[in-house]
């Protein structure tokens, strides 16, 4: 049997006050006598009244809800970003609604429209790439949009990111202290972060270190552990003795693949990865990583 929904009217009637008074108590308004406040709170507790968040949102023009679009909720990097967003949202008494897009352009648009239809106060869009379709969708909304994990090459949409060019240059220079052949293992180069920012940082570091750039040392792959594992033999065959890897799960796969093929890491092969997610602490040896915000 369905339980009857308790409304603000029920609380007001039971407490013998107006609905406006109940609303003031619920919203923490101090302009209520303490005896009245206590009486209303007692009724709220007894009836197990829970304010309707949707109705409150319509009245205040705010839902205190932030939508979060994530490309792969199983990916440790994006999962850690989502956790961080939730921690901050909780601090400010906001809720988050997470939708998984699977990194698919069509599904991204669907989940974005679904979240915006729920009148979220803003949207955090986590992705590897920003497609023209999703950019066009964002241009039509008045809701605040912030990117994380992706950058807008046109600098029209704000993002929370590091300087990928500088970071990649710094770690490549660090590896260049002990290595002559350094590989770059990156996600799809069509993504601006990889094909533009990280690649340019990698090339700049090689030039500064007096090393020759070779396309044969640039490996394009997908963002997954199996992809890194599969890539290990090719990286080994290239003659590289170090690698800058742009995804932690790929880095762990590469590490295990190299170890399985008899390579001693880090004695014979050094790896620096990019996201500093928790899985970098679980490997043996542990992986050095670029720190993300």
Question: Each predicted region: which residue ranges?
Answer:
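Periplasmic-binding protein-like
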Residues: 120-126, 183-186, 218, 236-247, ...
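Flexible loop/turn connectors
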Residues: 232-293
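Flexible loop/hinge segments that line or gate small-molecule binding clefts
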Residues: 103, 125-170, 177-181, 249, ...
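Short helix-capping segments at alpha-helix termini
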Residues: 91-92, 141, 206-213, 236-238, ...
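Amphipathic helical "hinge" segments at domain boundaries
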Residues: 49-114, 118-122, 188, 199-203
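Hinge/beta->alpha junction and helix N-cap segments in small-molecule ligand-binding domains
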Residues: 71-80, 98-107, 160-170, 185-231, ...
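N-terminal helix-turn-helix DNA-binding module of bacterial transcription factors
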Residues: 1-64
């Amino acid at each position: 049997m369905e339980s009857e929904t308790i409304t603000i009217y029920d609380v007001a009637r039971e407490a013998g006050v107006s609905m406006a008074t109940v609303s003031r108590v619920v919203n923490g308004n101090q302009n209520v006598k303490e005896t009245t406040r206590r009486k209303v709170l007692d009724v709220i507790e007894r009836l197990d009244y829970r304010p309707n968040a949707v109705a409150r949102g319509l009245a205040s023009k705010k839902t205190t809800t932030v939508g979060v679009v994530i490309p792969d909720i199983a990916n440790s990097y994006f999962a850690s970003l989502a956790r961080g967003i939730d921690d901050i949202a909780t601090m400010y008494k906001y809720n988050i609604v997470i939708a998984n897009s699977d990194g698919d352009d069509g599904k991204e648009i669907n989940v974005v429209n679904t979240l915006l239809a729920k009148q979220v106060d803003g949207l955090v869009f986590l992705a590897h790439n920003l497609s023209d379709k999703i950019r066009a969708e964002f241009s039509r909304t008045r809701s605040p949009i912030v990117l994380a994990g992706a950058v807008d090459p046109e600098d029209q949409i704000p993002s929370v990111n590091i300087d990928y060019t500088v970071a990649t240059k710094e770690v490549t220079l660090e590896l260049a202290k002990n290595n002559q052949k350094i590989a770059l293992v990156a996600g799809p180069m069509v993504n601006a972060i990889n094909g533009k920012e990280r690649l340019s940082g990698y090339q700049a570091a090689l030039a500064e270190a007096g090393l020759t750039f070779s396309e044969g040392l640039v490996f394009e792959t997908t963002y997954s552990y199996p992809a890194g594992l599969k890539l290990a033999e090719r990286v080994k065959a290239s003659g590289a003795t170090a690698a800058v890897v742009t995804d932690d799960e790929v880095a762990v796969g590469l590490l295990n693949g190299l170890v399985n093929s008899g390579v001693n890491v880090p004695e014979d092969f050094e790896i620096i990865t990019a996201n500093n997610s928790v899985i970098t602490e679980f490997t043996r040896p542990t992986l050095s990583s670029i720190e993300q915000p």
